[in-house]
Amino acid sequence: MRKKKFKAESKRLLDMMINSIYTQKEIFLRELISNASDAIDKIYYKALTDDSLTFDQDNYYIKVTADKEARTLTVTDTGIGMTKDELEQHLGTIAKSGSLAFKQENDSKDGHDIIGQFGVGFYAAFMVADKVTVKSKALGSDEAYVWESEGAAGYTIAPCDKETIGTEITLKIKENTEDESYDEFLENYRIKAIVKKYSDFIRYPIKMEETVNKPKEGSENEFEEVQEEQTVNSMVPIWRKNKSELTDEDYEAFYAEKHYGFDKPLTHVHISVDGAVRYNSILFIPENMPFDYYTKEFEKGLELYSNGVLIMNKCADLLPDHFSFVKGMVDSEDLSLNISREMLQHDRQLKLIAKNINKKIKAELKSLLKNKREKYESFYESFGRQLKFGVYNDFGANKDVLKDLLLFYSSKEKKLVTLDEYVSRMPEDQKYIYYASGDSYERIEKLPQTEMVADKGYEILYFTEDIDEFAIKMLTSYEEKEFKSVSSADLGIDSDEDEKQTEAEENEYKDLFESMKEILADKVKNVRASKRLKSHPVCFATDGEVTIEMEKVLNAMPDSQQVKAEKVLEINPNHEVFETLKNAHGQDREKLALYTNLLYNQALLIEGLPIHDPVEFTNDICKVMV
């Protein structure tokens, strides 16, 4: 029998497909099962247009059989089969797809779409097999043929005996090497796991022989092991069912079955789109974050299916980083089964799906926020930080998408509020959205800088996470109201009379403040009379964009450049301490230095900043006490 050569640059092309397109050897079984499913689909389609054919789905199946002794793995289908010419065309030409040609010829619009449109999947078998044998008998033919190949060298086609319509593909599994073990592809448990992973939702039964224990005939207490044919795939994916048929329990069972999380999901979104791009999707928003969520080990992404066949465990391109907590899957008939990660990044359909999913997630979160506030706050406790990162990242590109999902603790309401809720309560004379930063709500409430804003009756948002101020700086404003830190030099509250009084105090005590600035040198940008303090003697204000809390965050980072906020030491001119400062300025330079350093260190402590010289600080306290 003469060996024929493949109709392509076979060795180079075969090597490229095996080594580049497929990154995991187990993929070969997914490809063979998908081809088998296509073969049955073709009979189904023909039956729709040919009255002489009937399609009883119970008669159609795929069977996978392993033989350890012979080192063979066989995939059998009851599909349409192939003639000699079709074997030549579809298996003799690498990257020739019979399914694609069939689809183009028949232009199927009945929803029974064909998976294998790309003609390379079959050759994945050579990743695990030394030899591939294909026996096939075509529908309407009396003859059967066998196609055999040991790889790039070529193939043979000859007549063979086969009674039933369909195709039988037998792989002679490779022997183990030092680097690779191929025995796993002869183990039933491993084969079953691969089927469940990639082909669980193929619409036809995938059968395997399973070893089960059954009572011996005529004996109640004795059991024997027998081989029994069982269907190992689920066949009907939940995402193709009508939403009205499904309960919350159905979705929760799917969530658990797919190992998306150890707890129940907070909510789910079931999407079915039949437009410019067709896809089905089930998305889950978890209540609790995974233990590794804020680590570099965490991988975002949704499971990606092509017509029910898994093509990627985690497709990162489907989710923006700010929604990386979402779990779930997408199934589209418009995606290539053999598409690579690199190609996915530029796939137009995938980009459309990702854009739509992004909108659906936001809509679901907004619905939770509006209608199930307690649930949303539970979610926000786990993932609010990620939403804030989303506002800050990419130079604020997503801030408009996320701003209405943010929550912050309110000084007035004593609970989390949205920016919209804050703005809706603002008095007419309030110009800014005020915020204060600190380690906890309790500490922020005691900050001296909050006194003036609070006395004015204005609401203050409390920022307790390191990302908060960075996100707000990127947001800059909400509903045309700018954000303003209570530590800002200008709070936008003073009346004209207040301005005149402050200016007069600055002029009157100019020499005192200049002396204090001289004592502190470059530790502060300036010393001045405070407009914001009521009962406290001292605090820091900041000039410029970098606040004290931002300074802490930036300087805690690796390879920090030791960023410094432009600190201004503000003194309360109405506090008793101010009289002491005035007296010391006129009489005792050393005492002024002592009091100035004490007040500076007091301001550091209020902000939670380290004192530069704790020993000197304690000595200064002792000097005051004696």
Curated annotation (Swiss-Prot):
Keyword presence, Nucleotide-binding: yes
Classification via Pfam families: HATPase_c_3, HSP90
Domain of life: Bacteria
Region described as A: 1-341
Gene3D superfamilies: 3.30.230.80, 3.40.50.11260, Heat shock protein 90, C-terminal domain (1.20.120.790), Histidine kinase-like ATPase, C-terminal domain (3.30.565.10)
Keywords: ATP-binding, Chaperone, Cytoplasm, Nucleotide-binding, Stress response
The family this protein is said to belong to: Belongs to the heat shock protein 90 family.
HAMAP family registered for this protein in UniProt: HSP90
Protein name from the UniProt record: Chaperone protein HtpG
Organism phylogeny: Bacteria, Bacillati, Bacillota, Bacilli, Bacillales
GN (gene name): htpG
